[in-house]
Amino acid sequence: MTDPVTLPDLLAMKRRGEKIACLTAYDASSAALQDEAGIEVILVGDSLGNVIQGQPTTLSVTLDHMVYHTACVQRAARRALVLADLPFLSYCTPEQAVRSAARLIRDGGAQVVKLEGGRERLDVVRFLTEQNVPVCGHLGLQPQAIHRLGRYALQGRDAESACRMVEDARQLAEAGAMLLVLECIPWELAQEITAAVDIPTIGIGAGRHCDGQVLVWQDMLGMSARLPRFCKDFLAGNAGVREAVSAYVREVKAGIFPGDRHSFGRDGP
């Protein structure tokens, strides 16, 4: 069996220019399929609020929910690195964040925890890093901020917000973050951030120039009633789910996905 994927492996992949394939999973059977297909990172996302619980946002997801689903995924992930979201209001202070992370790691089996936010989260990222908790940042569209944002929309299109996001990325990396998710931002901005930091970037709706890509499992299989523009139905044209996951891995690795039709430009629609 191939050795388990580690954070140093992902850093080495960035240096080599090798793309990282990531998908969300919330249960053991999905995680097993992804693991067998060569997915390097499985994200147990708070998106389970949308696609598993049927909620309109991720805000109702609790730490107990995240621990349960992370444990389900971890049992089946023999090779892939397991990354788990810290849910809404579970990391308001460094002390609360480390307690929440302890549950995801001890009880859920996560290897990395993800949190949303930029410079306002630096104290939390530093404290977690000091306690040897690996952290993944999340910039761009932040679903946990939906009530402040008003709607799910492209972020970082204007010069001021783009410059702020680049600086946020640098500061998160300096504070100790080891991965960075970039969601729904112009591909030009994602390319700039990816070049500005030494840690791997994983994009969703952020173009092909990120170090890796992630999609929500249900979106990748075309199960959602309305697919976001940045998604592709990989089940269409393939014989089954296993083949669809393999196709996703191949296209990410080859730099085929995401294509222009799945990306946003600064001056585009």
Curated annotation (Swiss-Prot):
Entry's localization field: Cytoplasm
Cofactor: Mg(2+)
Keywords of this entry: Cytoplasm, Magnesium, Metal-binding, Pantothenate biosynthesis, Transferase
Cofactor note: Binds 1 Mg(2+) ion per subunit.
Single GO BP term: pantothenate biosynthetic process
One protein family per Pfam: Pantoate_transf
Binding annotation for 3-methyl-2-oxobutanoate: D46, S47, D85, K114
GO CC entries: cytoplasm
Pathway: Cofactor biosynthesis; (R)-pantothenate biosynthesis; (R)-pantoate from 3-methyl-2-oxobutanoate: step 1/2
Superkingdom to which the source organism belongs: Bacteria
Catalytic activity, EC: 2.1.2.11
Single annotated GO MF: magnesium ion binding
Active site annotation, chain numbering: E183 (proton acceptor)
Annotated catalysed reactions: 3-methyl-2-oxobutanoate + (6R)-5,10-methylene-5,6,7,8-tetrahydrofolate + H2O = 2-dehydropantoate + (6S)-5,6,7,8-tetrahydrofolate
Listed NCBIfam families: panB, PRK00311.1
Name of the protein in its database record: 3-methyl-2-oxobutanoate hydroxymethyltransferase
Organism of origin: Methylococcus capsulatus (strain ATCC 33009 / NCIMB 11132 / Bath)
Gene (UniProt): panB
